[in-house]
Amino acid sequence: GKRKMVAVLYLKNSWDWSGGYGFYLEHAGMGKAPRPNEDGYPAFMNFVSQYASCQKAHELFYNYVRFILTRTNRYTKKKYKDDPAIMSWQIGNEPRAFSKEALPAFEKWLAEASKLIRSLDKNHLSSIGSEGSWGCENDIQCYERICADKNIDYCNIHLWPYNWSWARPDHLIEDLGVAFKNTK
């Protein structure tokens, strides 16, 4: 608004450091989410893969989406769904299925979430917030399908060359070609 800037706001996070899937699963009665730094990423990923098919967790998220999109900005006095300072909504920061078995339910959930966002807000763009095929268990067809949803306006990809072992921090110049090739 004031500075002629617009924001891309994500509505949830896949990762434990800001709640994410584990938060919703815990509040849906699925038990305590493992903490990656304490319990390891395999335990964390196994637990959060349940999110894709947990309807109670989805409803908690949908209630949050309804609250945020219809909330009134106390400075502009506009509902967020009408606020021109917002460019777009992202369903999440790096949403993932966390297992190949969860992919069908993951795609279904993203379609439901994007439909809800569109039904509440026709003024702003909507996106997934994805890591590309990496967020779809390296299934590029899954990524293409979720991007083709009629309620998704654009797709993005978060790239993590170090995390995905495409480049080594101490050999970046040598590994740049591999990282570049893998982004295509």
Model-derived segments and spans:
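Active-site mouth of glycoside hydrolases
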Residues: 1-183
